[in-house]
Amino acid sequence: QSLTDTEQGKAIGLSYFNERGFTDQTIKKFQLGYSPEAWDALSVAATEAGYSKDYLVKTGLSVAKDNGQLYDRFRNRVLFPIQNVSGRVIGFGGRILTSDKNKPKYVNSPESQIYDKSNVLFGLFTAKTEIIKKDNCFLVEGYTDVISFDQSGIENVVSSSGTSLTSGQIKLIKRYTQNITILFDGDAAGIKASFRGINMIVEEGLNVRVVLFPDGEDPDSYAKSHNADELNAFLEKNSQDFIHFKADLLSKEAGSDPVKKAGVVKEIVQTIALVPEQL
């Protein structure tokens, strides 16, 4: 409500989402929000609405000072609600809108009885029907990647919310499809860091494909600068089998060094060995 019903919400929060190109329909669909700059605006409103201080602290919406006073964890941040597969909001990601280097760009809800980040995927509630229909799940890194793709008409997309992929998240996807396509921006270090998570997907018996975006682009930016037909065509043209992708990437890095080339062969064989025998 503070996003659309208050001057501060409209001037700061809504302006940010509009600048990102999100329509009112998209903002409503993903229940995007804003937590005001005041230290305790949400805490006060929630306690007045009947929520106990203990509940607000346990769910991570508020933080208790030593004197028992509450302040808002997400103050002065835009909010990305995280839903479970049934659509219930169980946590939040909050993005800061100032360039304060002393504060993290994103703050997430702490783990609680209702929020276990290793068993949650952002966007899965809105994506699951389309994942079943398309028999494929696109996996991206950030909240805005999911939202921009959805707005472009590609709804079978989820995010691990910037955390390393877990076996619990892979099993969630497996409920709906055997096929995962991972979308990477051009950051080689980030791609290599994700290999462990991808090996876990292979081990779970799912088919993994990879799409690499051009340098300087990510799923969010590409979806904004191309229409739905162009985006679909790009994904189809650039989708490649993970094991081939991994072999190409590591081979380029190894160059003509025989020791490094032998290491590449060993690593690829190890990945292939993870594929369950029943496949």
PLM features: residue spans?
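Short acidic (Asp/Glu) and glycine-rich catalytic loops that position anionic groups and cofactors
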Residues: 21-24, 102-107, 151-154, 174-178, ...
